[in-house]
Every structure is written in structure tokens, then in C-alpha cells.
């Protein structure tokens, strides 16, 4: 299957922040048949890329010591052509920028924000790393869903910030 064409505003990546990266690698490796490549520790903080059949499907990263009480969490990233403009749109539409846009050397720009209901979502502006290379197949992401405490506010937020066309 060719790599997917990912439109702005669409999910393009997931990663797991975990307290035990070795256990996570073993678990998902056995469950999905993932293989791993760990990036340069100095440049990328030891970020691990998961691949299925040689194609990127997800990332994993070890939580810092100061995050010890925080549960392990999967994050979804939405594609953006301009992470700075997206961060501004987030703030202008009732969201909160938790982590301002930052450069990931050679790979792209990322940011983490809370939508108008407080749900955390990432933004990825690609350069070298475009996002998923495999989707909707066994061992790869197939569906993303937002559980929210305020459905109408969430729908309006994603329509206004990402131009989503929703049928509700």
C-alpha cells in the first residue's frame, strides 16, 4: 500500500509517552509486529519510531522523571501547514496552547494544545517526517475519536481551527 496522502487537519501521527519504554516496545512488538528505530539521544531525546513492514506507524518516548505521577498516554497529532498559525487559531477559538510550536531538527514542527473543552491534541507541521506511512491495515492506526464533555463546543472548535467539514 502506498503512503497515505494526509490533508491539513487530519490525523497524521500518534505517539505513546510511557513510563517503561522497554515493556511498551515488547508489548506492541508482540501485539502488532512492530519493529523499532531509536533516534539520536542528543538530537531527538531517544524518541523511538515504530514501523510495520518497514513503514512508520507510531512513536514512543520515555517519560521524564518529573512526569512519574502522570499516566502513560497516547497522543494524536493533526497535520498543519503552519504550526504557528494553528497555535494562534487555537488561542483565538477558546483553546489553550500547552506547548508552543517547537522545531524537531530536520523532521518538522510540533505543538500541543487543549481544544475548547480541554482535550489535549498535538499538531505536526511536516518536513522530512511526513507522518504515518501505513494506515488502516493490521498493526497501524485506523480510527481516531475524541471523547468530550462538550460535543457542540468541540465540533465548533475543530471546524474553526482546522476547517473540518462535519456532519452532525
Question: Predicted regions span which residues?
Answer:
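Hydrophobic, ordered structural segments
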Residues: 65-132, 136-148
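Short, conserved beta-strand segments within well-ordered enzyme catalytic domains
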Residues: 15, 49, 59-61, 75-79
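Core segments of cupin and vicinal oxygen chelate
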Residues: 6-8, 12-55, 92, 100-112, ...
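Short acidic N-proximal helix/loop "leader" segments that mark the beginning
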Residues: 1-6, 123-126
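Short, charged/polar, Gly/Pro-enriched secondary-structure boundary elements
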Residues: 55-59, 119-121
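Conserved donor-binding loop and adjoining core beta-sheet/short helix segment
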Residues: 52-53, 60-69
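Short acidic, gly/pro-rich beta-turn/loop elements at beta-sheet edges
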Residues: 24-26, 60, 70, 88, ...
Amino acid at each position: 500500500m502506498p503512503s497515505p496522502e494526509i490533508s491539513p487537519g487530519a490525523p497524521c501521527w500518534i505517539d505513546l509517552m510511557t513510563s517503561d519504554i522497554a515493556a511498551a516496545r515488547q508489548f506492541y512488538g508482540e501485539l502488532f509486529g512492530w519493529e523499532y528505530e531509536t533516534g539520536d539521544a542528543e538530537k531527538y531525546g531517544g524518541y523511538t519510531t515504530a514501523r510495520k513492514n518497514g513503514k512508520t506507524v507510531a512513536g514512543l518516548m520515555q517519560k521524564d522523571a518529573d512526569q512519574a505521577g502522570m499516566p502513560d498516554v497516547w497522543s494524536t497529532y493533526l497535520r498543519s501547514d503552519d504550526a504557528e498559525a494553528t497555535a494562534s487559531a487555537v488561542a483565538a477559538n477558546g483553546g489553550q496552547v500547552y506547548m508552543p510550536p517547537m522545531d524537531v531538527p530536520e523532521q518538522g514542527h510540533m505543538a500541543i494544545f487543549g481544544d475548547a473543552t480541554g482535550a489535549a491534541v498535538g499538531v505536526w507541521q511536516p518536513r522530512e517526517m511526513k507522518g504515518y506511512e501505513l494506515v488502516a491495515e493490521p498493526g497501524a492506526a485506523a480510527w481516531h475519536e475524541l471523547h468530550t464533555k462538550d460535543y457542540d463546543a468541540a465540533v465548533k472548535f475543530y471546524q474553526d481551527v482546522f476547517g473540518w467539514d462535519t456532519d452532525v
